[in-house]
Amino acid sequence: MKAGNFSDTPEFFLLGLSGDPELQPILFMLFLSMYLATMLGNLLIILAVNSDSHLHTPMYFLLSILSLVDICFTSTTMPKMLVNIQAQAQSINYTGCLTQICFVLVFVGLENGILVMMAYDRFVAICHPLRYNVIMNPKLCGLLLLLSFIVSVLDALLHTLMVLQLTFCIDLEIPHFFCELAHILKLACSDVLINNILVYLVTSLLGVVPLSGIIFSYTRIVSSVMKIPSAGGKYKAFSICGSHLIVVSLFYGTGFGVYLSSGATHSSRKGAIASVMYTVVTPMLNPLIYSLRNKDMLKALRKLISRIPSFH
């Protein structure tokens, strides 16, 4: 880039997954299908939990909030991607890019916090069953959600305001389908040392600490389950936690994959594919993971679908 070639309000170009014009219709149909599946699956989870009184418990309340966050998270990036593919355009303005960065950080932080709360809920249910209703009361759930929301918003605003202080060169190309903070920092012409330090510190704090809490909860859960004398009791206890463990593995596994690919690989396509797994595939799979292995959820979904006139 040429020295002095700066722009106060730059326009970014999202390169997407492929520049091949022949692949664009296929990519459009693929991602439109995935987006609609994500919306439908998560919306069904929310409606099933709200319509069935048997599911009015902390565990299912947190699951419905997780589904709502997944809807919002996917809607932050997918509509713009679909519009760009359909219009065969790649541009996104400065305001739109900052908005994507901010909301992606908010919803990632919220999902992170909800997964920790769900792990704590399972820990209390298995390790302290007699005190479950006392500990996991609505007030505590509300306070924990509020705390998670405040932390996520503050984190997003901090990074967004720091990006506002940067100067960018023109002709900015992002090798992804949405504006990702790590790639935006690489395109800045001004010094990003403080930004990078903040990214590493906040990632360590808001990533490692919650994950450590989840690992601690499941260590205690496994210890308690192993003391159950019957094999049936052990299986039931582990089956309760199985779905959550799969979702946690997907969330943190794909998240670390995005983090490592952005810093360790020279292939922009690999990084873009890792981002697809993180922002598209995981929210789409979450409803399936939580419903297929859960008899109560399947029963509630059947009751909900049976109320739809066309299914009678």
From Swiss-Prot:
Compartment(s) where it occurs, according to its Swiss-Prot or TrEMBL record: Cell membrane
Topology Extracellular: residue spans: 1-25, 76-99, 161-197, 259-271
Membrane-spanning parts: 26-46, 55-75, 100-120, 140-160, 198-217, 238-258, 272-292
Residues bearing attached sugar chains per UniProt: 5, 93
Keywords, sorted A to Z: Cell membrane, Disulfide bond, G-protein coupled receptor, Glycoprotein, Membrane, Olfaction, Receptor, Sensory transduction, Transducer, Transmembrane, Transmembrane helix
Coiled-coil spans in chain: none
Chief location category: membrane
Superkingdom per UniProt: Eukaryota
Organism (species): Homo sapiens (Human)
Membrane-topology descriptor: Multi-pass membrane protein
Known role: Odorant receptor.
Cytoplasmic side: 47-54, 121-139, 218-237, 293-312
Family: Belongs to the G-protein coupled receptor 1 family.
Disulfide bonds: 97-189
PROSITE patterns on file: G_PROTEIN_RECEP_F1_1, G_PROTEIN_RECEP_F1_2
Source organism phylogeny: Eukaryota, Metazoa, Chordata, Craniata, Vertebrata
GO cellular component, one term: plasma membrane
GO molecular function: G protein-coupled receptor activity; olfactory receptor activity
Annotated PANTHER family: OLFACTORY RECEPTOR
The protein's name in its UniProt record: Olfactory receptor 7G3
One GO biological process term: signal transduction
